[in-house]
Amino acid sequence: MGQFISFMQEIPIFLQEALNIALVAVSLICIVKGLVNLYRCGLFQLMVFLVLAGRSCSEETFKIGMHTKFQEVSLSLSALLTNQSHELPMLCLANKTHLYLKSGRSSFKINIDSVTVLTRSEVNLTSINLTRSIDVFVHSPKLGSCFESDEEWVVAWWIEAIGHRWDQDPGLLCRNKTKTEGKLIQINISRADGNVHYGWRLKNGLDHIYRGREEPCFEGEQCLIKIQPEDWPTDCKADHTNTFRFLSRSQKSIAVGRTLKAFFSWSLTDPLGNEAPGGYCLEKWMLVASELKCFGNTAIAKCNQNHDSEFCDMLRLFDYNKNAIKTLNEETKTRVNVLSHTINALISDNLLMKNKIRELMSVPYCNYTRFWYVNHTLSGQHSLPRCWMIRNNSYLNSSEFRNEWILESDFLISEMLGKEYSERQGRTPITLVDICFWSTVFFTSTLFLHLIGFPTHEHIRGEGCPLPHRLNSMGGCRCGKYLPLKKPTIWHRRH
């Protein structure tokens, strides 16, 4: 008796669902069969194409789908290379022979030739206070007798970066800074006799941080490196890639792997570095060009799942070093070493090595400064930014990786539909069956429109759709965007 009473109580619910199904059926038959079928036949699309096609030839009019656009984002690393004391060093190679080093307000020129300027004297640092007019023979990174305090640390850092080991390798000659001839340090890298292994090691270090330099010394001949202060050339521009090579060369330890141990909490920051809740905004930190959107916790969640994305590497790099850069000019040079170790642990990994191999093999690679993503204009959702590859020192044209951003658009739409499906299933799990059923009815009722219909646009046979451009008989764009290709054209119904 109790079960029967429960069944009778549920009858109004069943009747209500049946009534809803009847209303949906009437709506599909009366409205969808009249208006949607006309839309699906292609007549309206053809009229719109003939009226609007060729009106604009700008790149901004290209769309992947109905609501997805191809966009890009560029990063600037100028915050890492500011003109302050104890900043990250900058390196420059001019005319493949002139080597330069700059950090803060100090800059140096590195000459490599066979001319001997300094000679060794039987005086060490302990007696330099008594004899300040002779050259100094040093075995440690303490170069206070050779350079000023703001120059000493960067010169010692550079010497260590090219492969010199203070506790094992031969000492260096430097001119006493009290002499009027000027500051100078001399390193013997002659690849002869007992100095051959030391010379080869320093040569390889120079080749690593100064890519493309010409070797002025030959096997068995005398070869000396001379470092002296000199103004920074005007034709040398800041290049973060050279700084990355320098930091990776001078690292003391290498992280074998890199994974996120916990979910990162990101926050908005203003130009002064003050935090505000709501996500992580690169634009407010002046690392992304203006008028671009902020990437919030959605992008960071994707970075926690995908560990091989160059864009995620850049986010981690900025997060790890934001506080270190802020205190870089206020603390001692030990802070710079900590910063270099942190950066090296992030960039000296398999991903950077893979990109460097691609560069050497003339294969497109990533330089971590420009990224592209697919943005859904209605919902505001976007895909995880991906690196814009480089070949022969120039960015690839967007048409060269067209398939990638089209697939990225498909993945974004699929992700949005899957999320919407999960939300609807959680809200109305019973009605979901009805929606699927009537979706099948809708599909079967409009299937015949695929057999008869109007073409919607014209494009080159076998090529991609040129929307919103209109083609002429020679396969070129009527507005002059593309040159005539002398290829046959064909009318299509859908893009």
Curated annotation (Swiss-Prot):
The record marks K33 as: Important for GP-C-mediated membrane fusion. Keywords: Disulfide bond, Fusion of virus membrane with host endosomal membrane, Fusion of virus membrane with host membrane, Glycoprotein, Host cell membrane, Host endoplasmic reticulum, Host Golgi apparatus, Host membrane, Host-virus interaction, Lipoprotein, Membrane, Metal-binding, Myristate, Transmembrane, Transmembrane helix, Viral attachment to host cell, Viral envelope protein, Viral penetration into host cytoplasm, Virion, Virus endocytosis by host, Virus entry into host cell, Zinc. It comes from the Viruses. Zn(2+) 1 binds at C57, H469, C477, C479. One of its GO terms (biological process) is virion attachment to host cell. Disulfide bonds join C92-C236, C281-C294, C303-C312, C366-C387. GO terms for cellular component: host cell endoplasmic reticulum membrane; host cell Golgi membrane; host cell plasma membrane; membrane; viral envelope; virion membrane. Zn(2+) 2 binds at H457, H459, C465, H495. GO terms for molecular function: metal ion binding. Pfam families: Arena_glycoprot. A lipid is attached at G2 (N-myristoyl glycine). The record marks S58, E59, K261, A262 as: Cleavage. Residues 2-17, 59-434 are extracellular. The chain crosses the membrane at residues 18-33, 435-455. Residues 34-58, 456-495 are cytoplasmic. Glycans are attached at N95, N188, N367, N375, N392, N397. InterPro entries: Arena_glycoprot (IPR001535), Arena_glycoprot_zinc-bd (IPR043015). Belongs to the arenaviridae GPC protein family. This is Pre-glycoprotein polyprotein GP complex. It comes from Tacaribe virus (strain Franze-Fernandez). The gene is GPC.
